[in-house]
Design a protein with these regions (language model features):
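Residue-identity detector for glycine
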Residues: 10, 14-17
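Class I SAM-dependent methyltransferase SAM-binding "motif I" and its flanking Rossmann-like core
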Residues: 122-196
């Protein structure tokens, strides 16, 4: 199907919008004829915060490789024939080790599948998307990264907390409270974080909250600093 702008301009707005949307879906299907893996950020859980591009990909997927998402509604967008594979992680409970997830994505991509790797938040914000992208690149499997809304921004926003404010805060720091347990040394610079200005956002840190707070105050963070613990 072809559809140029001059043809669209001569139509009523409703029909033009339908044709553009149809063309977009056909282009998506064409791009997915070859095996490809989409590393898709699902956002913080509210289905309404998924991007339009993300929903289009889920609706066209042949295989959905998904994490422990907050909303099962996202899975219902996939076609009935779509294969659904759960690889989620909760604290120390992993359905599959990360290395096996990487291998699975490579295998599915090489098999010519249209794979959507559905990840909570944003793939590249503590989502291990970088590791999966590395594995796909090294294996020569085509992939694309689709950003999602990170909970580092959405969580505070839903709680009524702006991470920046022109009068009070012109920078923010995001760090993890859950590092790789196989690391020989921590790469988390809590001393530097304590001395940094602006809002400080810790993700995946409820189990380490007391230890991190003690470390930050030990490095000079003012104990009276306003703080919030946001969990859903």
């Amino acid at each position: 199907m072809s559809c140029d702008n001059s043809a669209i301009n001569g139509m009523n707005p409703g029909m033009a919008g339908f044709i553009v949307a149809k063309k977009r879906v056909m282009e998506l299907n064409d791009s997915m004829q070859q095996g490809i893996v989409y590393l898709l950020g699902a956002g913080p859980g509210d289905p309404g915060l998924m991007t339009v591009r993300g929903r289009e990909l889920v609706e066209a997927a042949e295989v959905l490789v998904y994490d422990a998402l907050s909303s099962a509604e996202l899975l219902n967008w996939a076609p009935a024939a779509c294969e659904r594979i759960f690889v989620g992680k909760r604290a120390s409970r992993h359905a599959l080790p990360q290395e096996e997830i990487n291998a699975l994505l490579v295998k599915l991509g090489r098999a010519g599948k249209k794979v959507v790797r559905l990840k909570g938040g944003d793939p590249y914000v503590f989502g291990r998307g970088g590791e999966e992208a590395d594995a796909l690149h090294e294996a020569g499997v085509p992939f694309e990264v689709i950003p999602g809304i990170t909970s580092a921004i959405a969580g505070p926003a839903y709680a009524g907390i702006p991470v920046t404010h022109r009068k009070y805060c012109t920078q923010f720091t995001v760090f993890t409270g859950h590092e790789d347990v196989n690391k020989k040394e921590s790469s988390l610079d809590l001393k530097g974080i304590a001395g940094a200005q602006g809002t400080k956002i810790m993700l995946m840190g409820m189990q380490k909250l007391a230890d991190v707070c003690e470390a930050l105050t030990g490095y000079g963070q003012e104990p009276s600093t306003p703080a919030a613990a946001i969990q859903w």
